Amino acid sequence: MKKYLSFLLMAAVACFVMCGCDSRKSEDKQTVKEFKIMTDFEIAKSKAKINNKPVLLVFSGSDWCGWCVKLDREVFSTPEFKDWAADNVIMVIADFPAVKKLSPELVAQNEKLKNTYGIEGFPTVLLLDSDGNVIAQTGYQHGGAANYIAHLKSLMK
């Protein structure tokens, strides 16, 4: 009987510990600011004008360009970058995938943007004012999110 009670007590303690761990994880997830990468350039420019922020326009080949995948994985997908970007830029991706299908409207918009800004290689990252004028042009940078944020800050001055 004592062994049975001891086992029950240990099982109850384990359940409480596991429940406590899960709640801390969800609290951590809530600390990341809301961040959304947009695809509609005109809406992004309007949002940039309203919020007085520059537009970060990323030209990418998300499913075939190795440097694009690396930039997304090392920078754009990190909580550090998402937190910074949520406060400082309106981010838009003009994607040119090989396999993934985009709507005809999105394909047309991305082609028009590529031609308008004279994009010849991927990834190309443009920092624009809210009217769509180029402030700076860059691409992949070594060093992860912290280095990329510092690089973008230097371009925004």
Give each language-model segment a name.
Residues 68-84:
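Typically the conserved alpha-helix immediately C-terminal to a functionally engaged Cys/Sec
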Residues 23-32:
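Bacterial Sec signal peptide processing site at the extreme N-terminus
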Residues 1-8:
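Bacterial N-terminal signal peptides that target proteins for export
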Residues 37-38, 81-107:
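Thiol-based oxidoreductase modules, predominantly thioredoxin-like and allied folds used
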Residues 17-20:
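C-terminal motif of bacterial Sec signal peptides marking the signal peptidase cleavage site
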Residues 74, 115-157:
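Non-catalytic, surface beta->alpha helical segment in thiol-disulfide oxidoreductase systems
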Residues 51-65:
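Short active-site neighborhood of thiol/selenol oxidoreductases, capturing the structured segment around
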Residues 37-55, 85:
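A short beta-strand-turn-helix
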